[in-house]
Regions:
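Active-site Gly/Thr loop motif
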Residues: 233-235, 283-337
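C-terminal segment of N-terminal export signals and the immediately downstream linker at the start
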Residues: 28-51
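Active-site-proximal alpha-helical segments within enzyme catalytic domains
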Residues: 203-210, 250-271, 326-342
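A short, well-structured edge-of-sheet supersecondary motif
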Residues: 66-96, 328-329, 335-339
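N-terminal secretory signal peptides
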Residues: 1-10, 17-24, 33
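Active-site helix/loop module of the DD-peptidase/beta-lactamase fold
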Residues: 103, 122-161, 186, 215-250, ...
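Active-site SXXK
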Residues: 85, 102-128, 156, 207-211, ...
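Beta-lactamase-like hydrolase cores
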Residues: 46, 51-80
Length: 368
């Protein structure tokens, strides 16, 4: 048996490979820390705001972070942090309305990966070894390499489809293409699928189309039913393809507070207020190193549409990342979720990651 998770149709039973068992063990330890210091708080109808000192966060450190933003990252629109289930830091800049959704760009990929996890839990997808060729056979163009029909859900999730992709040039080609799915599935194969990581927004869109097909609903309707409404997320606009399908790789709009909810779902091992949205084993595998990643995520590793890293202090962490500096950054050991959001489209010379600000917030947290 390969060291990948195998979800069985019609059953909650999950078979684990070595990496998944290790991930669950590590997550159990950090979850125990969180449970030891706070009861579960569920922000479905709104976040609780608390004094940072009540949750072991140094307010002087947070004030120092807030003061750096206007001069150092003037494009930043919002910076928020949740610890122990309550907001302990929340700042908006440049006139940003807290209730106005922001285009989270490639953070959309982490939403799509989550929807794949829900579909697996519901038995709508047979398992991670199921292929796009089995689910959407009629979407393959006649020029597609036969290898592409055999690309599995695991490979789409981990960006190891082996399809050639240039992060900027092919994104522009995708936007101009009359059929995003056909354009992606018709790309050249440059390696054996499953062997090499290549960042591919088109692949995330294909993943979303397979989830929609399996659910029998448009992806946005499925997302609203199984993810957005249960978490109390009110999305804004969602970019659409020429086929009138929402873009599963980029272009969803969310408020910064709703972005926090997605990170909090994973921090709580896929559970939300007594309901298991995704299986704990899927949440663990999604946020565990599966493939090597590349410079797109600062050479972090890659899970299931999440980037895998560690803080400067060495705490395991994972994050969703969007063009321009959109972040949902989760540090389980600290029971911490940080969101950074940028509302306007940036010129290339303005691009500057707020990662060091996130690190400063993490450094302000006193370990439990």
């Amino acid at each position: 048996m390969s060291e990948k998770i195998s979800f069985m149709r019609g059953s909650r039973r999950v078979l684990l490979g070595g990496f998944a068992a290790a991930a669950l063990g590590a997550r159990a330890g950090t979850r125990a820390v969180a449970q030891a210091v706070t009861p579960d708080l569920w922000p479905t109808h709104g976040w609780t705001v608390a004094d940072p000192t009540e949750h072991g966060v140094d307010p002087i450190g947070l004030d120092a972070v807030a003061a750096r933003v206007p001069d150092e990252v003037p494009a930043l629109s919002a910076l928020l942090a949740v610890r122990h289930g309550s907001i302990v830091f929340e700042r908006y800049y440049g006139g940003q309305d807290p209730d106005a959704p922001i285009n989270v760009r490639s953070v959309t990929k982490s939403v799509t990966g989550t929807l794949a996890g829900v579909a697996l839990r519901q038995g709508l997808l047979a398992g991670l070894e199921q292929t796009a060729g089995e689910i959407i056979p009629d979407r393959f163009p006649e020029w597609a390499d036969p290898l592409v029909t055999g690309v599995t859900l695991w490979q789409w999730l981990t960006m190891t489809s082996a399809l050639q992709w240039d992060a900027y040039g092919d994104w522009q080609r995708l936007l101009a293409a009359p059929d995003w799915v056909a354009m992606t599935l018709g790309l050249p194969v440059v390696d054996i699928p499953g062997q090499t990581y290549v960042y591919n927004t088109g692949g995330s869109h294909v993943l979303g189309v397979t989830v929609a097909e399996a659910s029998g609903k448009p992806l946005e309707d499925y997302a609203d039913e199984v993810l957005f409404r249960p978490l109390g997320i009110t999305p804004g606009n969602w970019m659409r393809s020429p086929q009138d399908e929402v873009s599963a790789g980029s272009g969803l709009e969310m408020t910064p507070r709703d972005m926090l909810k997605l990170g909090y779902l994973y921090l709580r091992d896929g559970e939300w207020d007594g309901e298991q949205i995704i299986e704990p084993v899927f949440a663990a595998a999604a946020t565990t190193w599966q493939s090597a990643g590349d410079s797109t995520g600062g050479w972090a590793g890659y899970g299931f549409q999440w980037w895998i890293t560690a803080t400067d202090a060495g705490y395991p962490a994972y994050f969703a990342l969007g063009y321009g500096g959109q972040h949902i950054f989760v540090v389980p050991t600290l029971d911490l979720v940080v969101v950074a959001a940028i509302a306007r489209r940036l010129d290339p010379q303005e691009l500057r990651t707020p990662r060091y600000l996130i690190e400063a917030i993490a450094a302000s947290c006193i370990p439990d």
